[in-house]
């Protein structure tokens, strides 16, 4: 079973400000509650250490992430691979007529171990709330 979730956020901020957050692998990882820690290796790759509260997994999982598409300041797509799951995330920014922007987010998780997909199915909405909250906080803080 594959879990797919999409959600769009609206911001009263210029696309470049939203791009500054969403194109930053460190900020994306930091917004996700199950990411215990992470290392950014270069502009395209990072390792997320993910703790999933499911019986089959008793330690953190190393998820090797790589940006596979980047079209500044409009779109970034990444793929994360681990022994427990594969995740694809895509973020696309479009400017709105009022000078703000819309951020479309899509995530797909393919689980390799029992319980992984069920966990993400139950928790994806909360994780997207976390991402939106972190982005809004970033936009509200002074540069």
Give a label for each model feature.
Residues 15, 40-43, 68-73, 92-102:
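A short, structured loop/turn motif at beta-sheet edges
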């Amino acid at each position: 079973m594959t879990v797919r979730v999409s959600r769009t956020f609206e911001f009263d901020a210029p696309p470049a400000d939203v791009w500054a957050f969403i194109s930053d692998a460190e900020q994306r990882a930091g917004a996700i509650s199950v990411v215990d820690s992470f290392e950014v290796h270069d502009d395209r790759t990072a390792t997320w250490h993910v703790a999933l509260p499911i019986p089959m997994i008793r330690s953190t999982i190393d998820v090797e992430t790589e940006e596979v598409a980047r079209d500044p300041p409009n779109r970034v797509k990444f793929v994360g691979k681990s022994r427990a799951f594969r995740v694809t995330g895509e973020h696309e920014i479009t400017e709105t007529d009022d000078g703000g922007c819309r951020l479309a987010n899509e995530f797909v998780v393919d689980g390799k171990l029992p319980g992984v997909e069920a966990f993400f199915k139950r928790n994806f909405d909360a994780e997207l709330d976390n991402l939106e909250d972190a982005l809004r906080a970033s936009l509200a803080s002074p540069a």
